[in-house]
UniProtKB/Swiss-Prot annotation:
SUPFAM superfamilies: S-adenosylmethionine synthetase
Subcellular location: Cytoplasm
Source species, domain of life: Bacteria
E.C. no: 2.5.1.6
Pfam families in the cross-refs: S-AdoMet_synt_C (PF02773), S-AdoMet_synt_M (PF02772), S-AdoMet_synt_N (PF00438)
Organism: Caldicellulosiruptor bescii (strain ATCC BAA-1888 / DSM 6725 / KCTC 15123 / Z-1320) (Anaerocellum thermophilum)
Listed name of the protein: S-adenosylmethionine synthase
Database matches in PANTHER family: S-ADENOSYLMETHIONINE SYNTHETASE (PTHR11964)
């Protein structure tokens, strides 16, 4: 049976992604000086204005306006004619401390207060919020990500590359990509549709943009065997995309959570990542759930795996762990869930310890996806638990 699935990505110059990158640049700058800081940093951008707000508790000082401007400059908004300029935009900051009501639950977990867990056993941190998080992996690509989002990200990164390297100098920072993949019996067989929208300078013709994007962006990214004469390609389908970035649309941190994860191919708990320190389970537990799912697929126990984990604020142990292999598991989902509980410690402090998350590693994943990154060595992308999983699988 044939079916289609579509995922989208955006470039680093998209207004929402500008915000994600500034939020994570602030987080990284603080974690570099104070690894135990509490950070919840949100950003909004609009024409000529950046607003940085949130709750930050730290012993260090960072120059937030400078971090914001440097990030905008790196993205490529360096001239007013691009609709946004790192040097002339206004930067307003409004920062408070973390609520003491939240801090009391995170500083010392409920289990530690009740004496169930010694301080020596693990630094006892309760979850920073309630909620449920999902992790996913499948064997469609070498990085164990779904193919539609994998290709959409590669196209978006390629757009930025040809712009920054001067291959297509008329391109500007804002842009979006979208890929529709056709599946036969649950395996990707061809690319049905590609959509690329890219901001550009006013003097270039639509015909030139179309020809150049096909030649320098689409062909180098989409595997040759996946494109055919019936593949539909849409490039700047409105015909013009000169006004873009924060001048075209306002942006907010955390509005691209599907782009950040699996492109809609797997479920999402609703929590965003950027600007949050690792005591926030929205971020750390979602990374851990990806780590679990990826190791299960890498071990060969399933072709597809989705892991759900849930928490209560101030409580360290997960309330629930659920595994769904969509009928692809070599053993039952319940048995795999048992293996997960034995192999992985999903208490927030253990996640932070095992994945070494109190480091400035976040800005690099704030654009082009937090998962399946071939260009980065991310701890939650490692498949170093396969041996333990297979050993436990013999005992269940």
């Amino acid at each position: 049976m044939r079916k289609l699935f579509t995922s989208e990505s955006v470039t680093e110059g998209h207004p929402d992604k500008i915000c994600d990158q500034i939020s994570d640049a602030v987080l990284d700058a603080i974690l570099e000086k104070d690894p135990y800081a509490r950070v919840a940093c949100e950003v909004a951008v609009t024409t000529g204005l950046v607003l940085v707000m949130g709750e930050i508790t730290t012993k260090c000082y960072v120059d937030i306006p400078k971090i914001a401007r440097d990030t905008i400059r790196e993205i490529g908004y360096t001239r007013a004619k691009y609709g946004f300029d790192a040097d002339t935009c206004a930067v307003i900051t409004s920062i408070d401390e973390q609520s003491p009501d939240i801090a009391m639950g995170v500083d010392k977990a409920l289990e530690a207060k009740l004496g169930e867990m010694t301080e020596d056993e693990i630094e006892a941190i309760g979850a920073g919020d309630q909620g449920m998080m999902f992790g996913f992996a499948c064997d469609e690509t070498p990085v164990l990500m779904p193919m539609p989002i994998y290709l959409a990200h590669k196209l978006a990164r390629r757009l930025a590359y040809v712009r920054k390297e001067g291959i297509l100098p008329y391109l500007r920072p804002d842009g979006k990509t979208q890929v529709t993949v056709e599946y036969e019996d649950d395996k990707p067989v061809r690319v049905d549709t590609v959509v690329v929208s890219t901001q550009h300078s006013p003097e270039v013709t639509h015909a030139q943009i179309e020809a150049d994007v096909i030649e320098h962006v689409i062909k180098p990214v989409i595997p040759e065997g996946m494109l055919d004469k019936n593949t539909k390609i849409f490039i700047n389908p409105t015909g013009r995309f000169v006004i873009g970035g924060p001048q075209g649309d306002s942006g907010l941190t955390g509005r691209k959570i599907i782009v950040d994860t699996y492109g809609g191919y797997a479920r999402h708990g609703g929590g965003a990542f950027s600007g949050k320190d690792p005591t926030k389970v929205d971020r750390s537990a979602t990374y851990a759930a990806r780590y679990v799912a990826k190791n299960i697929v890498a071990s060969g126990l399933a072709k597809k795996c989705e892991v759900q984990v849930s928490y209560a604020i101030g409580v360290a142990r997960p309330l629930s762990i659920r595994v769904d292999t969509f009928g692809t598991g070599k053993i039952s989902d319940e048995k795999i869930a048992e293996i997960v509980k034995r192999v992985f410690d999903l208490r927030p402090a253990a996640i932070i310890r095992d994945l070494n998350l109190r480091r400035p590693i976040y800005k690099q994943v704030a654009a082009y996806g937090h998962f399946g990154r071939e260009d980065l060595d991310l701890p939650w992308e490692r498949t170093d638990k396969v041996g333990e999983i297979l050993k436990e699988a013999q005992n269940v």
